[in-house]
Amino acid sequence: KQEYIKEWFANYFLNYSDISFDFRDGKNEMTIHHSYLDNWKVTVVDTGYDTMTGGRIKRIQEYVGDEPFFMTYGDGVCDVDINKLLEFHLLHGKIATLTAVKQAQDKGILNIGGDNAVKAFREKNANDGAPINAGYMVLQPEIFNYLTDDTCVFEQAPLLKLVEEGQLMSYIHTGFWQCMDNMREKNKLEKLLFEGLSLRHISEPTRLRRISYA
């Protein structure tokens, strides 16, 4: 549904401005008085309907340049402080950092060493207390060397190779996190919203502006 995202940004300036429309006496004039815009540069990329997660990241390579960038799947709600996440990533100097949370989820989990390096992936059950991948990452441009084509699944060969080479670190998040992969999880989030869930919002702008949605 990329067309909805493109339409939203195409109308962003119009919808966040004070505007007068003058149609008197046959005129057709628009006067913009004030605008209330964020200092953004947004690139919306068509990565292909059937493209796998690694292939989607590969397709944005030309827009990223030579600086680190954030990556998220866009199917979870989290109050992680991305400024602290970025600071942690820049300090350790590895290629990739993923955010890890401890949640009762039936998903693949992480074996994490004492130095926060990810040692292995394995499957878990709902009662397993080990951390899982929360889906918020910081990646160096070198990550593109681990990606092949549209069939590349980021969570398989690329991440496993990063683990083998000691290039994947974990940032432990102890705040709110909830994925939305199915109707049950959607209902859970809507119930929290209805009950007045208040998440901490990050007001301090981060130095990185590029975010990839795989």
Positions of predicted regions on the chain:
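Single conserved hydrophobic/aromatic residue that forms the stacking wall/gate
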Residues: H201-A214
